[in-house]
Amino acid sequence: MAETQNDPLLPGYSFNAHLVAGLTPIEANGYLDFFIDRPLGMKGYILNLTIRGEGVINNNGEQFVCRPGDILLFPPGEIHHYGRHPDASEWYHQWVYFRPRAYWQEWLTWPTIFAQTGFFRPDEARQPHFSELFGQIISAGQGEGRYSELLAINLLEQLLLRRMAVINESLHPPMDSRVRDACQYISDHLADSHFDIASVAQHVCLSPSRLSHLFRQQLGISVLSWREDQRISQAKLLLSTTRMPIATVGRNVGFDDQLYFSRVFKKCTGASPSEFRAGCE
């Protein structure tokens, strides 16, 4: 029987956790000076922040050189083929492997450098803050206290939100707090099979018609369409990262009838739930 690998910096580590974080200090000709090669990617996401030196990311013939301050996001299934740039003497990068909470999906849609590999570079003034958050996530994630993992996940959520705040600050006016609260309420009640707009409107102290108008004005989509997108996104996440029965996945996103869930899922994704899950394995 093969020996279990307990070092996440070395090949063979299972990453069978909600969050694993660390620092990979690659020096030329050192014991970590090899290329990570995962052609099928991983089941979770990986965030990667370069802090020293240069790394090179390869993807089907394309290449990207990452430098200090660059943050990359590898989603589930994305090719992982990266290592120290041959012209650099070192590549130090911090990383966080995680399985996201359902309502994070919007925050994980990043501009890409190629394929599905996301990219974000904070401006010079903000880089120290993002670097500090990364360090706090790693410190919490490697802790052994009862709440260490939960603290790390919450710090990661803060990092993702701070990136969203930076992007929105430069591209969009602030979202109406009532629309934001409505989105949060909907995300928190995806399993409610008796959902209606009136309950959301009541929660944010608006009439259903006013909420519908504001929602479409700010997000460019109806309340029901946005909820449907969130349900399908959550279903895809559960299908790809758990062995939960399909009927249970459906109930988790508000479908009491498995056949109806399968029809809606296939209409939205082009594949049945079982076909989608098989494609993720």
Curated annotation (Swiss-Prot):
Gene responsible for this protein: araC
Cellular localization per UniProt: Cytoplasm
DNA-binding region per Swiss-Prot/TrEMBL record: 198-219, 246-269
Domain HTH araC/xylS-type as annotated: residue spans: 180-279
GO-annotated biological processes: arabinose catabolic process
Assembly and oligomerization: Homodimer.
Any one GO cellular component localisation term in the record: cytoplasm
Name assigned to this protein: Arabinose operon regulatory protein
Superkingdom field: Bacteria
Family annotation (SMART domains): HTH_ARAC
PROSITE patterns recorded: HTH_ARAC_FAMILY_1, HTH_ARAC_FAMILY_2
Origin species: Salmonella typhimurium (strain LT2 / SGSC1412 / ATCC 700720)
UniProt keywords, alphabetically: Activator, Arabinose catabolism, Carbohydrate metabolism, Cytoplasm, DNA-binding, Repressor, Transcription, Transcription regulation
Keyword Cytoplasm listed: yes
Ligand binding (alpha-L-arabinopyanose): P8, T24, R38, Y82, H93
